[in-house]
């Protein structure tokens, strides 16, 4: 019975920590860049895009395809960084609770 109560307490702690982490992820910002800095995408670790910066040299009709490719690349770079920030927070939580890495998280 004590084991069950301990597990319930641990589950409640995990839920509380997860809620805290979700709030924190909204404040963590990462920036993805492409084209040597010609395009930058800033987003939160919750994957909310905050801003997109484009070098004026790319704002020409003949540069449209290049700009599109750079935007996709910068967004992908920012997404990977946001996912890494999320994983880091998750590992900090599961480590403190003595759970194995990746426990219950895709």
Swiss-Prot record:
Any one annotated GO CC term: bacterial nucleoid
Keyword Cytoplasm on entry: yes
InterPro entries according to UniProt: YbaB-like_sf, YbaB/EbfC
Main location: cytoplasm
Cytoplasm among keywords: yes
Domain of life, source organism: Bacteria
GO molecular function: DNA binding
Keywords, in A-Z order: Cytoplasm, DNA-binding
Location of this chain's protein in the cell: Cytoplasm, Nucleoid
Function: Binds to DNA and alters its conformation. May be involved in regulation of gene expression, nucleoid organization and DNA protection.
Family of this protein: Belongs to the YbaB/EbfC family.
Subunit text: Homodimer.
Listed name of the protein: Nucleoid-associated protein BRADO0764
Record organism: Bradyrhizobium sp. (strain ORS 278)
